[in-house]
Structures are given as structure tokens and as C-alpha cells.
């Protein structure tokens, strides 16, 4: 609910449909691959639920499959981050490839779908369109961006945390 609230109130984005994929058919982040099977046409824009949108977002719609370049983290992990994804048209081959041997691929790509997308698919990356709370937990809001990622620190979105970002969530 926070994501829809932030999109509707701060992002400036217009959309035809807002959907949260809740099917838990796979382990963790691999569930988000189902969106490539469900959405096979038109312009698509995906956001992880653990982000903060606090201002008008730039145009993130892309023709080619596009993810974030994870410029904020150690390269030893992966240089991709799938907290924001866009594509136009049919990218169902991503899900179909995963679905054929999902059990094996979940183990092979223990770092998650970022690693799988980077190693197995032709994926573009955005320029710097957001930043991570990683190493910025006590810093003021970065006015150079309109989106901050929590990157597995979603606990900081819970009541009791008093960072600047909580002002952009649904009133509690």
C-alpha cells in the first residue's frame, strides 16, 4: 500500500493498472520473474515494494529490458539491481527460461535474479536514477534523486524508524 500511495502522491506517474504480484511459487525474489509471463505487451514499469518515492520520477519507461546499474554496491555481488525494471512488449522468454529448470536456477543464482539477468540475458541498465539507503542511513534526503532503495533493509520502513523517508509513507 505504501508504494501505491507514493506513486499516486509524489511520482507524477500515470498508469493504467497497479498490480502487486503475490503468488509465491518460487524462493524469494525469483517470484518477481512471473511478471514477464503475465505482462507480454505494452509498456511495463516495475518497482520493488521496499523503495521510497519522494519526488517526481524521471521517465523510466524503456523499449528494451532495463534494470538498475547497482553503482552503490560492491561489484563482487552483481552489477545489476532489479528494484526497478522496465520493458515494452514480450519479454516472456525470461520467465520461460527460468521456469524450465527453476529449481536448479534458484541454486545456481544464489545471489538472486540480478545475477541471472546479468549472466544469461541481454539487459540494458539505467543511468543513475536512484540511490540506496546503504551507507546513507543517517544522511538527509538526496535531492539529486526522487527514489531511494531500501535494498533488504525493509525493516527501516516499519513503524518506530524515524528517518526522513517515513514522511512519504501512508499516514500511520
Language-model-derived ranges and their functions:
Residues 1-29, 41, 151-157, 162-172:
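N-terminal anchoring/stem segment of glycosyltransferases
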Residues 2-4, 24-26, 51-53, 71-76, ...:
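Short, solvent-exposed loop/turn segments at secondary-structure junctions
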Residues 11-13, 38, 57-63, 142, ...:
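Short loop/helix-cap segments at secondary-structure boundaries that form the rim of catalytic
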Residues 13-16, 23, 39-43, 61-66, ...:
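Short glycine/proline-enriched coil/turn segments at helix->beta-strand junctions
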Residues 20, 45-48, 67-68, 123-128, ...:
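A structural signal for short, well-ordered beta-strand segments and their strand-loop junctions
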Residues 28-79, 86-87:
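GT-A fold catalytic core of metal-dependent nucleotide-sugar glycosyltransferases
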Residues 80-81, 144:
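A generic structural signal for well-ordered coil/turn residues at beta-strand boundaries
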Residues 89-172:
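Catalytic core and acceptor-binding pocket of nucleotide-sugar-dependent glycosyltransferases
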Amino acid at each position: 500500500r505504501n508504494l501505491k500511495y507514493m506513486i499516486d502522491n509524489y511520482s507524477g506517474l500515470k498508469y493504467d493498472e497497479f498490480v502487486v504480484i503475490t503468488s509465491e511459487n518460487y524462493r524469494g525474489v525469483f517470484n518477481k520473474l512471473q511478471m514477464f509471463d503475465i505482462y507480454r505487451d505494452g509498456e511495463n514499469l516495475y518497482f520493488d515494494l521496499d523503495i521510497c518515492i519522494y519526488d517526481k520520477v524521471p521517465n523510466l519507461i524503456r523499449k528494451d529490458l532495463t534494470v538498475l546499474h547497482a553503482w552503490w554496491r560492491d561489484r563482487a555481488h552483481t552489477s545489476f539491481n532489479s528494484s526497478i525494471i522496465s520493458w515494452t512488449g514480450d519479454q516472456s522468454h525470461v520467465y520461460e527460461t527460468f521456469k524450465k529448470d527453476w529449481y536448479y536456477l534458484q541454486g545456481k543464482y544464489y545471489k538472486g535474479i540480478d545475477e541471472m539477468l546479468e549472466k544469461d540475458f541481454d539487459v540494458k541498465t539505467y543511468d543513475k536514477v536512484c540511490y540506496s539507503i546503504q551507507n546513507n542511513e543517517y544522511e538527509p534526503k538526496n535531492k539529486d534523486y526522487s527514489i531511494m532503495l531500501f535494498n533488504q533493509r525493509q525493516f527501516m520502513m516499519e513503524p518506530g524508524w524515524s528517518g526522513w523517508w517515513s514522511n512519504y509513507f501512508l499516514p500511520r
